[in-house]
């Protein structure tokens, strides 16, 4: 996944590019919309870093999530929450992490009790390992959605 900017400088995550327009997602709100390609330019920021930086303060300050080590890992947690259950191969294909960095971040999130293994039967390849967020992680993200 790439990041792009519109003419006003607002950053988006590029979901899908077509011939004349692209579907983009606002990393703060998760809202998706189409924007003309002529109105977008590439951004050099990592998609996971952008997602992490866009995490609401209320989520960052949640006692259960405070232990996340850095913004990129927080972005990974948000993306897992958005796409769950999601396979490791899908994450490797979608984001700018090498296998070693991804597994390190997943191990950190697992050790903190923020993600757990998930069954991917029928979703991806049979030998792909999957993850989903834990109940306490979902509760932290849901609380901010309900607050506005």
Language model features: what each stretch is:
Residues 75-83:
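Short amphipathic alpha-helical elements of helix-turn-helix/winged-helix folds
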Residues 1-57:
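DNA-contacting interfaces and partner/effector-binding or oligomerization modules
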